[in-house]
């Protein structure tokens, strides 16, 4: 009895359904459900701009006339799931999968056949359908949408002129390309219909764009195509990767099985040491590996060949719809691609003003309408944002379960791949959407147990896969870097950021190419910071070794120059000639010389680290006041290690990863499930996102959750607030970084911009960076113009200072509206004024430049009245007139209204929050306080702002 009780603690109860079966049933039940179940990705219906009653009438009229239209098929697809026997085809078999890209419909909407239940109205269209306020009705649809072509399947449409104009406008962009036959769209193939080859490729590209249903995967393909620099560069990269893989495997097989190494000493030619028919005499393990790699290579080849069609579609999309040729893809910026995507979205309207905002909140709108820079970044980084938050909040337990290495974390590329396989593939479905089952606490225990079993299973699989990966990567690394190290031995000590450092430095909604550019710019400053610290003993030994090895190498080199024929063959030791020792001494001299710093370097580690923080945006709270200490250097050195050490850790991680998956990660499975449930929000039209990645542009920095020592009294920390906040100012830095990358439209100003001469600081002298004007070097951090923990970085970090930035010629006291953001995403100046009042004395340095003379005021061509706190009074008054406009610039002109509210039923709550912001801005005095300040201002005769 006792043994059975013990086993029951580890084994699932008999008869209970598997968690994977529950997930599959839940996904199948929500496949055709409404907006909330499908995470905001509603079916793209051509007639979605009409009301419920209009859609019902149009559908009924279309069925009476036995017309099959795209809208009818799409509405039928939105029904609740039927029984398996009802969904099966007449032959009883499943429908054949289409070879279309993953962002296209698996089958054309017209491929479905009508049945007896087509008159049933979908549940998603019954929301408030019983109201009698929707009186307009549509007449029967015309018999033919295009009189010139009777064979084309017509679509139901209105006959009134206003609605007909909108109908035709919508139909122009989603009209399928013409063909010589009347077959449905989903059955058009160029092989069966040769006439399709003559169709305008722009129309075909427009038709594909209009029929994109999985916008996440489509935008991901668009971004990967952008990173790959076009179709030809992508194809060339894949061909070279296949050739590289074949060369590494083939050459490794040749070196290990086809050479008789004992004969090398007494042989003179290659034929003397070759093993005849070496492949036939290989061992069983070598033969198995060779066949395994061969099948993998053939599989990748077929995968690349089948993927050419998708690449061609992306090429047509860039060329014909975005106007970007294959050559321009290599030079165009991603911001320009985003602007053209938004222009393409605006040229294909899918939301009409006839539908009230109340109905749009419930029914949702076309997901393509949510496609500005913020929404695109959230779609592309839906999974990455969760990973950034997991690393930032230390949810993952990656400690090595080894007695002498328990304090060391293991995070390598192999571990990253396992986390994506175990966690992300478990939480997200094939469409990249978060499974709503994880948002229900009723399944917490089952989901946690399932995640724990996935970790254990992945650890077992790593044992079988690790030997093959270790052999391949060791050979690949040897072939790639050995020649480089031989030519430049100093590169052996070169450093790079670890995978853990990349996830710590990366910000929310920061795409990979933007993050890579920022990190690459930080490498010179990181190397200089590491070299700053005093290592006097190491430097003395290195200089001594460099002197001895250099002297020996110089004598041997001079002797070989005097008599090369005699001296190069001279053996200094047994079978070791002068040439051999020249290589040895030269390598030792180069390595020792690389350890010694330049004699002209200036020692200032604090300044070097501040320069580095401007790019990494990583400033833990524990570093405050200790930037000069060796402990901070050790913490940073863990994130910035030598390349050879990172490679060895990658190899060793393939051995230790199973132990982490077995013993460490299962301990945090409960926290992982809780994390996805508690830090997930729903955004209409986009889906479920990480709460930290959804920037509240309406209120600026007032509501950005931060956890830093400067935020409040450390003795009065609110544990709940800290739990739902990011660490080290991650979210605020991400907010400012996002505005730096996409806020390209600057505010108009009456002053003429002043462009100072370029700053050219040297890496060896901090005086060229702006501190030369200071008479004495202060020691405390605040007077060094350094960032504080949790504060923003970059150009936007000047918001809230008493002096505007000198560089760039524009004012950054409030963020400027951007053409890459929709009106509801425009940053609000209200939140930035309140944020400025919280910390008016924070002087942040910009990574784009630094003032040479901090004591001098910026040069302005025209004087403008300023308030006492140094801010432009006209800007403050204009912000006061706007009050608490939560949508920023241009909200009233938005045709979206409030249809994109994250919580459609929280109108009263938002109004209450905005009222609280008014009190905060006014200084907390309320209405009486405002009246008192206004009377005081009138008595003093001032015309400046009164604190509003």
Swiss-Prot record:
Residues 907-917 have a biased composition (Acidic residues). Residues 878-892 have a biased composition (Low complexity). One of its GO terms (biological process) is autophagy of mitochondrion. One of its GO terms (cellular component) is Golgi membrane. The keyword Transport applies. It catalyses: a 1,2-diacyl-sn-glycero-3-phosphocholine(in) = a 1,2-diacyl-sn-glycero-3-phosphocholine(out); a 1,2-diacyl-sn-glycero-3-phospho-L-serine(in) = a 1,2-diacyl-sn-glycero-3-phospho-L-serine(out); a 1,2-diacyl-sn-glycero-3-phosphoethanolamine(in) = a 1,2-diacyl-sn-glycero-3-phosphoethanolamine(out); a 1,2-diacyl-sn-glycero-3-phospho-(1D-myo-inositol-3-phosphate)(in) = a 1,2-diacyl-sn-glycero-3-phospho-(1D-myo-inositol-3-phosphate)(out). Residues 455-475, 644-664 dip into the membrane without crossing it. The chain crosses the membrane at residues 231-251, 288-308, 544-564, 577-597. Residues 1-230, 309-454, 476-543, 598-643, 665-948 are cytoplasmic. Residues 844-853 have a biased composition (Basic residues). Signal peptide: none annotated. InterPro entries: Autophagy-rel_prot_9 (IPR007241). Residues 66-79 have a biased composition (Polar residues). Phosphorylated by atg1. Atg1 phosphorylation is required for preautophagosome elongation. Keywords: Autophagy, Cytoplasmic vesicle, Endoplasmic reticulum, Golgi apparatus, Lipid transport, Membrane, Phosphoprotein, Transmembrane, Transmembrane helix, Transport. Residues 252-287, 565-576 are lumenal. It is a multi-pass membrane protein. It is found in: Preautophagosomal structure membrane; Cytoplasmic vesicle membrane; Golgi apparatus membrane; Endoplasmic reticulum membrane. Residues 163-172 have a biased composition (Basic and acidic residues). It comes from the Eukaryota. PANTHER family: APG9 AUTOPHAGY 9, AUTOPHAGY-RELATED PROTEIN 9. Phospholipid scramblase involved in autophagy and cytoplasm to vacuole transport (Cvt) vesicle formation. Cycles between the preautophagosomal structure/phagophore assembly site (PAS) and the cytoplasmic vesicle pool and supplies membrane for the growing autophagosome. Lipid scramblase activity plays a key role in preautophagosomal structure/phagophore assembly by distributing the phospholipids that arrive through atg2 from the cytoplasmic to the luminal leaflet of the bilayer, thereby driving autophagosomal membrane expansion. Required for mitophagy. Forms a homotrimer with a solvated central pore, which is connected laterally to the cytosol through the cavity within each protomer. Acts as a lipid scramblase that uses its central pore to function: the central pore opens laterally to accommodate lipid headgroups, thereby enabling lipid flipping and redistribution of lipids added to the outer leaflet of atg9-containing vesicles, thereby enabling growth into autophagosomes. Belongs to the ATG9 family. This is Autophagy-related protein 9. The lineage of its organism: Eukaryota, Fungi, Dikarya, Ascomycota, Pezizomycotina.
């Amino acid at each position: 009895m006792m043994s059975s009780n013990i086993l029951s603690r580890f084994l699932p109860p008999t008869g209970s359904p598997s968690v994977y079966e529950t997930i599959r049933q839940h996904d199948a039940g929500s496949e055709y459900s409404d907006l909330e179940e499908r995470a905001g990705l509603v079916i793209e219906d051509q007639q979605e701009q009409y009301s419920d009653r209009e859609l019902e009438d149009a559908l009924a009229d279309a069925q009476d006339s036995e017309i099959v239209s795209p809208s009818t098929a799409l509405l039928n697809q939105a029904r609740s799931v039927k029984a398996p026997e009802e969904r099966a085809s007449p032959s009883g078999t499943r429908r054949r999968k289409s070879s279309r890209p993953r962002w296209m419909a698996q089958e054309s909407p017209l491929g479905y056949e009508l049945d007896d239940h087509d008159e049933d109205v979908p549940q998603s269209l019954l929301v408030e359908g019983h109201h009698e306020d929707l009186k307009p009705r549509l007449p029967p649809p015309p018999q033919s949408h295009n009189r010139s072509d009777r064979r084309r399947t017509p679509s139901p449409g209105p006959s009134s002129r206003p609605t007909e104009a909108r109908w035709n406008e919508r139909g122009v962009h989603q009209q399928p390309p013409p063909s010589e036959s009347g077959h449905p769209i989903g059955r058009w193939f160029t092989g069966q219909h040769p006439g399709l080859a003559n169709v305008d490729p722009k129309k075909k590209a427009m038709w594909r764009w209009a029929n994109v249903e999985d916008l996440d995967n489509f935008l991901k393909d668009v971004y990967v195509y952008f990173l790959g620099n076009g179709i030809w560069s992508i194809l060339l990269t894949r061909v070279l990767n296949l050739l590289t893989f074949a060369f590494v495997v083939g050459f490794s097989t040749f070196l290990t099985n086809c050479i008789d190494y004992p004969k090398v000493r007494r042989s003179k030619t290659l034929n003397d040491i070759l093993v005849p028919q070496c492949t036939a005499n290989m061992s069983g393990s070598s033969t198995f590996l060779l066949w395994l790699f061969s099948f993998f290579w053939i599989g990748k080849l077929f995968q690349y060949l089948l993927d050419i069609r998708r690449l061609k579609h992306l090429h047509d999309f860039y060329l014909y719809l975005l106007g970007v040729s294959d050559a321009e893809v290599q030079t165009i910026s991603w911001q320009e691609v985003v602007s053209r995507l938004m222009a393409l979205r605006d040229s294909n309207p899918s939301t009409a003003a006839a539908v009230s905002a109340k109905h749009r909140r419930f029914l949702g709108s076309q997901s393509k309408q949510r496609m500005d820079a913020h929404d695109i970044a959230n779609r592309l980084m839906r999974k990455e944002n969760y990973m950034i938050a997991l690393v930032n909040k230390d949810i993952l337990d990656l400690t090595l379960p080894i007695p002498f290495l328990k304090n060391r974390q293991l995070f390598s590329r192999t571990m990253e791949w396992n986390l994506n396989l175990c966690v992300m593939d478990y939480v997200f479905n094939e469409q990249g959407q978060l499974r709503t089952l994880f948002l229900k606490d009723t399944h917490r225990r089952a989901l946690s147990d399932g995640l724990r079993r996935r970790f254990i299973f992945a650890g077992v699989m790593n044992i079988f896969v690790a030997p093959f990966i270790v052999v391949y990567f060791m050979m690949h690394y040897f072939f790639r870097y050995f020649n480089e190290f031989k030519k430049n031995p100093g590169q052996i000590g070169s450093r790079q950021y670890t995978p853990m450092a990349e996830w710590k430095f990366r910000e929310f909604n920061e795409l990979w190419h933007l993050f890579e550019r920022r990190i690459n710019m930080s490498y010179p400053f990181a190397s200089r910071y590491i070299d700053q610290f005093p290592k006097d003993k190491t430097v003395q030994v290195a200089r001594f070794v460099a002197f001895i090895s250099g002297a020996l190498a110089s004598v041997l080199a001079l002797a070989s120059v005097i008599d090369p024929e005699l001296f190069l063959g001279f053996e200094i030791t047994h079978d070791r000639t002068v040439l051999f020792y020249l290589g040895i001494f030269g390598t030792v001299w180069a390595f020792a010389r690389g350890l010694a710093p330049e004699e002209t370097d200036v020692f200032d580690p604090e300044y070097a680290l501040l320069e580095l923080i401007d790019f990494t945006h990583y400033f833990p709270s524990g570093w405050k006041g200790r930037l000069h200490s060796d402990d901070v250097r050790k913490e940073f050195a863990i994130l910035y290690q030598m390349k050879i050490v990172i490679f060895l850790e990658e190899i060793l991680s393939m051995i230790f990863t199973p132990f982490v998956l077995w013993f460490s990660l299962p301990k945090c499975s409960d926290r992982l499930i809780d994390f996805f449930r508690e830090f997930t929000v729903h955004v209409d039209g986009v889906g479920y996102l990480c709460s930290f990645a959804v920037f509240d542009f309406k209120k600026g920095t007032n509501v950005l959750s931060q956890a830093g020592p400067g935020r409040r009294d450390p003795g009065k920390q609110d544990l709940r607030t800290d739990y739902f906040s990011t660490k080290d100012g991650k979210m605020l830095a991400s907010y400012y970084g996002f505005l730096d990358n996409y806020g390209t439209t600057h505010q108009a100003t009456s002053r003429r911009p002043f462009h100072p001469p370029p700053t050219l600081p040297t890496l060896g002298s901090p005086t060229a960076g702006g501190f030369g004007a200071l008479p004495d070097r202060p020691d405390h951090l605040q007077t060094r113009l350094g960032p504080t923990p949790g504060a923003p970085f970059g150009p936007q970090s000047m918001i809230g200072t008493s002096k505007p930035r000198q560089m760039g010629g524009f004012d950054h006291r409030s963020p400027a509206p951007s053409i890459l953001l929709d009106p509801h995403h425009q940053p609000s100046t209200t939140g930035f004024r309140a944020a400025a009042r919280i910390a008016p004395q924070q002087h942040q340095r910009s990574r784009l430049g630094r003032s040479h003379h901090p004591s001098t005021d910026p040069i302005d061509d025209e004087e403008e009245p300023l308030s006492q706190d140094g801010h432009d009074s006209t800007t403050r008054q204009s912000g006061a007139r706007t009050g608490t406009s939560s949508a920023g610039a241009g909200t009233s002109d938005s045709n979206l209204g409030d249809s994109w509210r994250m919580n459609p039923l929280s109108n009263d709550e938002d109004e209450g929050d905005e009222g609280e912001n008014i009190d905060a801005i006014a200084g907390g005095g309320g209405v009486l306080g405002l009246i008192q300040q206004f009377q005081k201002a009138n008595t003093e005769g001032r015309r400046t702002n009164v604190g509003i």
